[in-house]
């Protein structure tokens, strides 16, 4: 289902953790806004459950999407997201997520959004629900998603290692050439040695 749950009159949390479309990119959350319900943005309406896929309906090419894992009970997301809840008996949410975040689908959704009549590129949740998808058996979906998830984890690890190495190189450069230049080193013009 899409957008199955929203805040209603019986919503019992006074404080919410709000996620807007600009605070998540390619599954990475930059942060939540903790806010009292009475002061929440007007778009703070969508409720999410574990393994729901959130996909921004505005400018799909910006890749504001993610999959919800172990949400706090008071997590609320923007109505700018389509919230997709998978039928766990038939589909693996991670498989659907990888499908929806593939370049081919993102580019297709961006093309549809660009053709919209609104003031900015956007699409309706119906566009997402009407995408054709090949569904292997549930065990195959889980296997495919597991492999892709493992590759994503390795890519994330490599990015973190690169950041660490860049920081180390910068520190060593500063230490060797700025802070602790050897007394015996001669100062000269670069043009004299090249």
Language model features with spans:
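A short beta-sheet element
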Residues: 44-105, 118, 124-125
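Sequence-specific dsDNA recognition surfaces
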Residues: 1-53, 68, 191-194
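A short glycine-rich beta-alpha junction/loop motif
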Residues: 75-80, 116-145
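Hydrophobic residues in beta-strands and at strand termini
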Residues: 21, 86, 133-135
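Non-catalytic DNA-recognition/assembly elements of restriction-modification systems
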Residues: 1-10, 130, 134-194
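Well-ordered mid-protein domain cores that form the structural environment of catalytic cofactors
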Residues: 101, 106, 111, 132-134
């Amino acid at each position: 289902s899409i957008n199955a749950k929203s805040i209603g009159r019986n919503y019992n949390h006074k404080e919410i953790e709000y996620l807007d479309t600009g605070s998540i990119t390619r599954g990475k959350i930059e942060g939540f806004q903790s806010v009292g319900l009475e002061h929440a943005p007007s778009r703070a309406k969508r409720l999410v459950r574990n393994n729901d896929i959130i996909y921004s309906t505005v400018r799909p090419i910006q890749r504001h999407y993610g999959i919800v894992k172990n949400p706090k009970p008071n997590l609320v997301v923007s109505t700018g997201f389509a919230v997709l809840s998978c039928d766990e008996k038939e589909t693996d949410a991670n498989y659907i997520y990888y499908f929806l975040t593939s370049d081919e689908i993102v580019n297709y959704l961006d093309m549809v959004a660009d053709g919209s009549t609104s003031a900015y590129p956007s699409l309706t949740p119906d566009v997402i629900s009407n995408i054709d998808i090949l569904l292997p058996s549930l065990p195959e979906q889980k296997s495919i998603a597991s492999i892709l998830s493992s590759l994503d984890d390795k890519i994330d690890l490599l990015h973190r290692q690169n950041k660490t190495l860049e920081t180390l190189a910068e520190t060593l450069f500063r230490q060797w050439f700025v802070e602790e230049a050897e007394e015996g080193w001669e100062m000269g013009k670069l043009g004299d040695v090249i």
